[in-house]
Amino acid sequence: TDRNFLRL
């Protein structure tokens, strides 16, 4: 998932 990306 792009959860890490959404963290930005």
Swiss-Prot record:
<comment type="similarity">
    <text>Belongs to the FARP (FMRF amide related peptide) family.</text>
</comment>
<feature type="modified residue" description="Leucine amide">
    <location>
        <position position="8"/>
    </location>
</feature>
<keyword id="KW-0964">Secreted</keyword>
<comment type="function">
    <text>FMRFamides and FMRFamide-like peptides are neuropeptides.</text>
</comment>
<dbReference type="GO" id="GO:0005576">
    <property type="term" value="C:extracellular region"/>
</dbReference>
<dbReference type="GO" id="GO:0007218">
    <property type="term" value="P:neuropeptide signaling pathway"/>
</dbReference>
<keyword id="KW-0527">Neuropeptide</keyword>
<protein>
    <recommendedName>
        <fullName>Extended FMRFamide-5</fullName>
    </recommendedName>
</protein>
<keyword id="KW-0027">Amidation</keyword>
